[in-house]
Amino acid sequence: MFRKRNRLESYTYDATGYYFVTVCTRDKEKLFWENNAPCRVPVLSEDGRCVEKYLRKIESVYPCVLVDKYAIMPNHIHMILHLTAEGGANVSTVMQNFKRAVTMELGKSVWQRNFHDHV
């Protein structure tokens, strides 16, 4: 069985521009919010705080990448990445290293194999 490609074949993912990226947890497991948060504003779980920590570090690791906006949902995250310089970094490398850093700190695999994007 063939896996559907998530990337545009003819597009360079290191081109300057904005990228809307979604990353899901493995098996859609709800890991990032506290389950019994009594308030209307969601409270991040320990795993969710780790995700936020590494989202905030992306810009220091990749100076040509800005995290314009992000939302941490119970079982996935959304972010808008702005690549500000050609050839400085590509979206796949940024996401691979982000996911790896979170996995290493948490000591468990939390991510779905790939990520989804809109260019």
Kindly give the residue locations of the regions a language model identified.
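Short catalytic/metal-binding and nucleic-acid-binding patches
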Residues: 1-119
